[in-house]
Amino acid sequence: IFGQIFRNARAIMYNSFEEQILINAVSDNAHVPSVIVGVGSKVPHHTAPERFRRKFKIDHPFIIYVGRVDANKGCKQLFEYFIRYVTNVSGKLSLVLIGNSVLPIPAHERIHHLGFTSDKDKFDGMAAAELLVIPSQYESLSMATLEAWGLGRPVLANGHCDVLKGQCLRSNAGLYYDNYEEFAEALHALETSSPLRKGLGHNGRRFFS
């Protein structure tokens, strides 16, 4: 049914190159006129990262996840990877989660679930974080990724998601992983290298704009 719809459309607007490639492959509709339009996104000109730290009593450097806390979003694997990382590689980082949860969250001193927050808290949290982590395999376009780049923060993404991987490669503003070993190596590189974080973050701002 959907294949016929995509083949008979007069024109199609796609959110990303990877989305276009997928639809072309499954629908055989490369003949249909199309354009990559992305989606509009705004971030504040000024943020208050220290206000966020004081409000939520977070003293350690942290990485942040923004979105529904759900196994389908890769959060169960993220918990496993992160706990393994802070146990065996580096115990300095915390993981901050912003968003409603439909998944049990491990009771761990370095995992902080803030629930649903205001946009101000969300953006201040992103600005305070070392990086944004996106563990989902299934994204057609990640708004949180674009927002993080708009704020000059690098991204660590699930490399099994073609869209996220493609965005990281085109922007040169993020790293990606396919397994725990790559997750740990990429996270350790980002955690320990301020020049790397700043360089990727700078590229992210440029890509966002």
Predicted regions and their residues:
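Short hydrophobic beta-strand element within catalytic cores of glycosyltransferases
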Residues: P154-N158
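Aromatic "clamp/platform" in nucleotide-sugar-dependent glycosyltransferases that forms part
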Residues: Q137
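Helix-loop-beta element that forms the nucleotide-linked donor phosphate-binding surface
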Residues: R7-N8, Q20-S41
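Acidic anion/phosphate-binding donor-loop and adjacent secondary structure
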Residues: N24, G38-K55
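Conserved donor-binding/catalytic core segment of Leloir-type glycosyltransferases
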Residues: M13, F56-K73, F79-I83
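Membrane-proximal helix-turn-helix segments that form the acceptor-binding/catalytic region
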Residues: I1-I12
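Conserved acidic donor-binding segment of nucleotide-sugar-dependent glycosyltransferases
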Residues: F116, G174-E181, A189-S194
